Swiss-Prot record:
This is Levanase. Residues 1-24 form the signal peptide. Optimum pH is 5.5 for inulin hydrolysis. It catalyses: Hydrolysis of terminal, non-reducing (2->1)- and (2->6)-linked beta-D-fructofuranose residues in fructans. Exo-fructosidase that can hydrolyze both levan and inulin, leading to the production of free fructose. Is also able to hydrolyze sucrose and to a small extent raffinose, but not melezitose, stachylose, cellobiose, maltose, and lactose. Levanase cannot be detected in the wild-type B.subtilis but is mostly secreted into the culture medium by SacL mutants, especially at the end of the exponential growth phase. Belongs to the glycosyl hydrolase 32 family. Optimum temperature is 55 degrees Celsius for inulin hydrolysis. Is rapidly inactivated at 60 degrees Celsius. High stable at 50 and 55 degrees Celsius.
């Protein structure tokens, strides 16, 4: 009998697990309008600069500027994700929170292999994060360390490690180990200059030099520097140093962008080998900023890899995406190549992206003219890679290329202007572009001459972006676009003449995001208002007032329960279970935990007006998980907090309706949401 009971219990557990797993596989996860399918985005909320890029123990760490309580830039934290392949990402909890020294601005992370800091406590090498803290505009540099592969972090008791020397803008430290002199080197943005510091232990830093006066572009404040060495044309005996700098305004295509310098670094000073007024732009699009490279890539790999923030400070806060805002670019490999005009940085997509290709389509030796039938008329998609090689001569079409994400009155042109020898992206007809007047500025161009009579285009299209690599990455254009979901067409075109296409391959690219981490035995969740998202903590809702989401399930008598956590963010208000609701959440019952007023409350909405039925006074803390359960039978309602009966009340206004969730003046998360009839 005991054995039979154990078997039944095991079977019940398996069935329950299967039910949760099936319900968790909600196809709506990472499927909102404009949601990138293979680019990194946070599950919810605002993101900007990538930070703390470090590789350790088989994982690429991506930290990023993150506002957990809003869709616009706000109090900065470090969000965190890891990847084993640069393609699929695992979301992790926030790594660094603001403290009395300020919010957490951009910075870097390193593996302290020799334990120079003395932070190591176990067998794992310490990861050390170096970041800016901003308190009401006063910026200093601080550090934190991790002894568990970056899962938890301890802030150094001696912070800040570099106090402010009297500069308004003093931020974004990028640190690397300089093996030749066995020391750490930091590059730090200060106004429109880069300051260089050195250290033996990551805790005490010495000022070494300054770079930037009268060098390159000074259209805006300099930010997010990086400094690294690369071989020229792969020759290990010929190496040069690259200084990458983000510029807050005045970039080549308007607004924020990136420039770089090529030269020499002797351990304390960087020297630009080009004329001071020569500006080398990293990307000619509107939407590539704050890119920094991963540190500690193994010598067996030796690639210099990075990614950037795909947005522009002119309109970043207004881009109409929800429940998240902003994406990173695809990861790219950086190389130095010698051209007739000098040594230049080239960027190519990482080879790992080839693993998400679907069934490819190929064409060879096509001739395209304005009168040609669109050979790509049968192609449809919103996430794909294009590889094309065109033969170009003085008699070729004046313009040729692709129209991607085409639909009714929508398309984005990615092409080549032969007469002016320019690669271009034109998003003026790409879709939603009225949210900010700075967004639709027409065509972005990059100088690109044919090589041996050929022009190569490699184009990555996602639901809200295009990244174009011309002639094996010599020039790059990165732009976000916002077409309708239905705009999935593709066209190969030529204007004012014909052009020969030597080869063309289109690779569909697969979605890299898996099943939702939100656990519930109900489906069909539909947002009524506010901002809702599935996150690693559960279903997150955020609103300054009342916000609702409803499932497709309904009932009259039931047990309905959930884990609820009110986050320490905007409002510190309440999270609620809603039941017997109408389809608009204007009428129905709610049971909540209220951190603002320290109570559990049972109330109802009648035509949108709230009235309290019963309440129980008890401390409700933010960032603490509570289990709230409601039992409904006829007109009687029992409400339990952490399995303790706190309210037993009667009301007969509503007899049945839908199940849902509510937040009021808060960011709250709900997990393990279940109902039993």
């Amino acid at each position: 009998m005991k054995k039979r009971l154990i078997q039944v219990m095991i079977m019940f557990t398996l069935l329950l697990t299967m039910a949760f797993s099936a319900d968790a596989a909600d196809s709506s996860y990472y499927d909102e309008d404009y949601r990138p399918q293979y680019h990194f985005t946070p599950e919810a909320n605002w993101m900007n600069d990538p930070n703390g890029m470090v590789y350790y123990a088989g994982e690429y760490h991506l930290f990023y500027q993150y506002h957990p309580y809003g869709l616009q830039w706000g109090p900065m934290h470090w969000g965190h994700a890891v990847s084993k392949d640069l393609v699929t990402w695992e979301h992790l909890p926030v790594a660094l929170y603001p403290d009395e020294k300020g919010t957490i601005f951009s910075g870097s992370a390193v593996v302290d292999k020799n334990n120079t800091s003395g932070f190591q406590t176990g067998k794992e090498k310490p990861l050390v994060a170096i970041y800016t803290q901003d308190r009401e505009g006063h910026q200093v540099q601080s550090i934190a360390y991790s002894n568990d592969k970056g899962r938890t972090w301890t802030k150094y008791a001696g912070n800040p490690v570099i106090p402010n020397p009297g500069k308004k803008d003093f931020r974004d430290p990028k640190v690397f180990w300089y093996e030749k002199e066995k020391k750490w080197v930091m590059v730090l943005a200060a106004g429109d200059r880069i300051l260089i510091y050195t250290s033996k232990n990551l805790k005490q830093w010495t000022y070494a030099s300054e770079f930037g006066q009268d060098q390159g572009s000074h259209g805006g404040v300099w930010e997010c520097p990086d400094l690294f060495e690369l071989p020229v044309d792969g020759n290990p005996n010929q190496k040069k140093w690259v200084m990458q700098v983000s510029v807050g305004n005045g970039a080549v295509s308007g607004g924020s962008g990136m420039q770089y310098f090529v030269g020499d670094f002797d351990g304390t000073h960087f020297k630009n080998e080009n004329p001071p007024n020569k500006v080398l732009w990293t990307d000619y699009g509107r939407d590539f900023y704050a890119a920094v490279s991963w540190s500690d890539i193994p010598s067996t790999d030796s690639r210099r890899l990075w990614l950037g923030w795909m947005s522009n400070w002119q309109y970043a806060n207004d881009v109409p995406t929800s429940p998240w805002r902003s994406a990173t670019s695809i990861p790219r490999e950086l190389k130095l190549k010698a051209f007739t005009e000098g040594v230049r940085v080239v960027q190519t997509p990482v080879k790992e992206l080839e693993t998400i290709r679907g069934t490819s389509k190929k064409w060879k030796n096509l001739t395209i003219s304005p009168a040609s039938h669109n050979v790509l008329a049968g192609q449809s998609g919103d996430a794909y890679e294009i590889n094309a090689e065109f033969k170009v001569s003085p008699g070729s079409a004046a313009e040729f290329g692709f129209k991607v994400r085409t639909g009714e009155n929508q398309f984005t042109k990615v092409g080549y202007d032969r007469r002016n020898a320019k690669l271009f992206v034109d998003r003026s007809e790409s879709g939603n572009d009225t949210f900010n007047p700075a967004f639709n500025t027409g065509k972005e161009t990059a100088p690109l001459k044919p090589v041996n009579g050929k022009v190569k285009l490699r184009i990555f299209v996602d639901r809200s972006s295009v990244e174009v690599f011309g002639n094996d990455g010599k020039q790059v254009i990165t732009d976000i676009i916002l077409p309708d979901r239905s705009s999935k067409g593709l066209e190969l075109y030529a204007a004012n003449g014909g052009v020969k296409v030597k080869s063309l391959t289109i690779h569909p690219l697969k979605k890299v995001w898996g099943t939702t981490p939100f656990m519930s035995n109900m489906t069909g969740w539909t947002t009524v208002n506010g901002t809702w998202a599935d996150t690693i903590e559960g279903k997150q809702g955020r609103s300054d007032g009342d916000s609702f989401i409803l499932s497709s399930a309904s009932g009259s008598d039931f047990t309905y329960e959930s884990d609820i956590t009110i986050k320490d963010g905007n409002g510190r208000g309440a999270g609620a279970l809603m039941f017997r609701s109408d389809k608009d959440a204007k009428n129905g019952y709610l049971a909540n935990v209220d951190a603002k007023h320290d109570l559990v409350k049972f109330f109802k909405f009648e035509n949108g007006a709230a009235s309290v039925i019963a309440e129980y006074k008890t401390p409700i803390d933010v960032n603490k998980k509570y289990h709230l359960k409601t039992e409904a039978e006829g007109d009687r309602f029992k409400i339990y907090l952490d399995d303790r009966l706190v309210i037993d009340a009667h009301d007969s206004v509503f007899s049945e309706g839908q199940f849902g969730l509510n937040v009021w003046d808060a960011t709250a998360v709900f997990q393990n949401v279940t109902k039993e009839s």
